[in-house]
Amino acid sequence: MNMGRVWEYIYWRLPVGKRQFIDRANQMLEKVDGLKQTLELGIKNSYNHRNQLYEQMSRKIDGLSREVRKLHEENTRLERIVTHYHKQDMQMFWEEYRKEGETTIDAQKRFFLSLPKAQGINRNLQLLEKDLLRAFSEICEENQMEYWLYAGTLLGTVRHKGFIPWDDDIDTCMAREDIDRLKEILKNNEEYCLTVKYDAWGYCKQIRFGYKNSELPVFIDVFPFDWACLASRESWEANHRVKMELKAELSNEENALIREFRAAGCVDVDSVIGKQVAVIFDKYYNKLREDHVLCDKEEAEGFLFSFDSWNPCDDSNINAVSQFFPLQKLEFEGLTCNVPNQYMYILHELYGEDFYTFPCGEPHFIHADWKKNKKLLAEEVKKRVK
């Protein structure tokens, strides 16, 4: 049907004359054209307005980016100045503090050993953690499982013979297979437990030794490590790649299990979700074994902090076996505890050459707020600490 016949069809059904019909049709066409022009103009104006807004936003973002860069550069400059003067102040301080005939390092050791212990809430927390470390160490020794003190706890052991006064946690390390053994050994223990949880947002396992029946979440951290075929950069890179692959898979919320896991945040390894998540973690561990990155203790030349550990997977996390084993013994708060064989080398690697100095800036990361549990914390100390 052509348009002429359409108009003819409409014309014979309208109660108006031909002239009136044509006039009315022309009026309608003019209105349609007007609406079309108005619509096109509106679209054009909207498009132009959007472009103007985009340009304005781009200019503002560029300006803010420049400001951020300037602030970052200024902050870096100020940090260098503060660090410079901090070092100068420290040099002057140690020069004044040093006794006649005493070396600077001996003066530093004397100073840090003379610092008073923590007080109040922080000290009560430290005392409970010390009690846990005592039990942890005894259980490991009785069952021929090797552990050692690490990070801030190792620094405190060497520098303070105990806790750094402003610290509030204990860090230990253990081989993956010994952690599995320890969990089994403690299964029926009435006093202590080893909790192992998958952390959806840390992309790792949280492993903690603590009291079985306690109203307070007091614990010591246990970081796993794996035996490596080689103490090489290539081993670290393979471990790091797997860590990144695990992180990517645990971020994929198109997967229903991952959505459920991330909604829960943290799940016990023995829970329904935990057992499903374990399949993902085990897949990456088996990959490292199959690729001959990881091996058994007897074949290892090095070890890696595990890809599923909370520890950051940086390039200091590959070590030769000889740097850590055989373990040595040092005093920590009156306890005799394991430390790495070359513990001074490890501390220099972690904290730089001069760890016998005051921290520049904020010295302490607060791991938990215990003020609301102050009374309960004191009661737990009386009950448990001998």
Task: Please report, for each region that a protein language model flagged, where it lies by residue.
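Surface-exposed, flexible loop/turn segments at secondary-structure boundaries
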Residues: L155, D180, A228-L230
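Conserved catalytic core of two-metal-ion nucleotidyltransferases
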Residues: A118-E141, L186-H240, M244, N252-Y351, ...
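Beta-sheet entry/capping signal
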Residues: E146-Y147, D171, K329, T336
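Boundary detector for helix-to-coil junctions that initiate low-complexity/charged tails
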Residues: M1-T103
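Helical scaffold of the NTase/Pol beta-like nucleotidyltransferase catalytic core
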Residues: N75-L149
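Active-site nucleotide-donor binding segment shared across nucleotidyl transfer reactions
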Residues: S137-I170
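Catalytic metal-binding acidic patch
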Residues: H160-L182, G334
